Amino acid sequence: MRKTENTNDKSTALDEMNALDIVTLMNEEDHTVPRAITPCLPLIAEAAETIVSRFEQGGRVFTAGAGTSGRIAVLDAAELPPTFSIDESRWTGLIAGGYDAMWMPLEENEDDREKIVADLKAQSFSKDDVLIGVTASGSTPYVLGALSYAKQIGAASVSISCNADTEAGKLSDIAIEVQTGPEIIRGSTRLKAGTAQKMILNMLSTAAMVRLGRVYQNEMVNMRLLNQKLAGRAVTILMNTTGLSEDEALQALKESGNDIKAAIFMTLTNGTLEVARRCLSHENGHLKKAIQYHRKGF
């Protein structure tokens, strides 16, 4: 039996516990998740570098999952365009049952290996892309169908599961298998397994975006200024990275057309917007490299 389906001996009297005891046990169990992920960090880093390599060549990322795994995959993908200004088509989350499954249980769809292939074909999924299959059990047919198709066409593939020696892992170029162990409610992998999957997807997408130059120092310099909170954050980013006052930062953003990277570049180099764009383009959007390129007398 898969360990995610085993009985957790610490919770066999769960139905007799008061609320404080339940949440205390849950918190203790959740603390085991980061430790379980630690041995997988080299594989997670390898997967992130694979994503970077494909992305730089124009490839895309597709994450596929069913139930909780699919919802987490879609959630992570949805955060990337506003945070890092990537086109929505570059990182797509696919869930068994389609987007209706985000809001209602459509678990019967997870047994369909063919639907995901049709979905990927509809997206023109190719050998240049990356498929990330997310399945706590490591045996979800929907995800296995996606990984099999990726293997068939020569696309890069990564699996994230919470058991050892999984079918998903055997179909993947990189198999990330986190041993999260039994849940406090037997088989309810929305708990520790879901937490582990979210943490790993956070790592993959964040590490890839940082490596792709979407972050300067530790600031979100590629974010879209879609509301007042983000506009205010952009001002703070300018102040933190350049030493400008608030009024000066507002003016710098205005002169750059609300392009945070360009505003920082212009401030630190005394360059024009045209020069900023040229240097950033030369360095594929890496702000620090663009500044260094300018200082070398581009």
UniProtKB/Swiss-Prot annotation:
Segments forming domain SIS: 51-214
Active site per database record: 79, 110
InterPro entries: Etherase_MurQ (IPR005488), MURQ/GCKR (IPR040190), SIS_dom (IPR001347), SIS_dom_sf (IPR046348)
Gene Ontology BP terms: amino sugar catabolic process; N-acetylmuramic acid catabolic process; peptidoglycan turnover
GO molecular function, one term: carbon-oxygen lyase activity
Enzyme class: lyase
Pfam families referenced in this protein's UniProt entry, alphabetically: GKRP_SIS_N
Keyword Isomerase: no
CDD domains: SIS_Etherase, UBA_TAP-C_like
SUPFAM superfamilies hit by this protein: SIS domain
NCBIfam families named in the record: N-acetylmuramic acid 6-phosphate etherase, PRK05441.1, PRK12570.1
Described function: Specifically catalyzes the cleavage of the D-lactyl ether substituent of MurNAc 6-phosphate, producing GlcNAc 6-phosphate and D-lactate.
Family: Belongs to the GCKR-like family. MurNAc-6-P etherase subfamily.
Note: A lyase-type mechanism (elimination/hydration) is suggested for the cleavage of the lactyl ether bond of MurNAc 6-phosphate, with the formation of an alpha,beta-unsaturated aldehyde intermediate with (E)-stereochemistry, followed by the syn addition of water to give product.
UniProt-recorded name of the protein: N-acetylmuramic acid 6-phosphate etherase 2
Lineage: Bacteria, Bacillati, Bacillota, Bacilli, Bacillales
Gene giving rise to this polypeptide: murQ2
